[in-house]
């Protein structure tokens, strides 16, 4: 299996993160699976929907490129899943998203989930995302730390910064647990990977879910099932396949000119 892992960070600005991610992906996938990390430049450095929109467009183009280069699946390694539905409507290979995969799998581990994101400006986005996935009754709370995406990358080169992130995450997670949350999800691949060093990571018995290996395993499963059954996403509604000329137009006119 050959998988394209789409990070919303580029190597130039996230070298320590990419290096750690490379190791973690290799630990998470089957021995016969190859995962190639690809970035976005300029990277997602500021928490805002406009940045998500820009990065989503590039991700969709990259999903088309991945399919044309013979990849078996794409993983959107960005918890906000920006561009997910549009990418699925543009390609026939599986597109697995970090946020969706983590939330869906976590519903098998706990009845009530909580998310701790890195920045308060992401909270509205997450609520829209939760509603879109039909999980409003299961993901019952979203709290936030106070980092920009670019700032939290510094934790990969500083033990002091990493400890600061861990403490802030616990401070935001504990009130959710007190309110009845059964499991906590770090709202981003960057904090997920940062916390992956903690085996059976819990806060007051509530598991802290690392979604990166979940997304990898879901991608491998999607590839295997597609090979066995021939089935992919439904083309009747949200994922109706765009005509080829529309896809080519999208690729050729990034500014709509």
Predicted regions and their residues:
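Glycine/small-residue-rich loop that forms an oxyanion/phosphate-binding "nest" at active or ligand-binding sites
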Residues: 60-109
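N-terminal glycine-rich anion-binding loop in soluble enzyme alpha/beta folds
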Residues: 1-54, 121-159
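Short, glycine-/small-residue-rich phosphate/pyrophosphate-handling segment
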Residues: 16, 108-145, 222-257
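Short acidic, glycine/proline-enriched helix-loop-strand junctions
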Residues: 84-96, 194-214
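Active-site rim beta-loop-alpha module in soluble metabolic enzymes
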Residues: 132-189, 196
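Periplasmic-binding protein-like
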Residues: 6, 68-78, 180-189
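Glycine-rich, highly charged phosphate/nucleotide-binding loops
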Residues: 49-65, 163-171
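Short, flexible loop segments at boundaries between secondary-structure elements
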Residues: 208-228
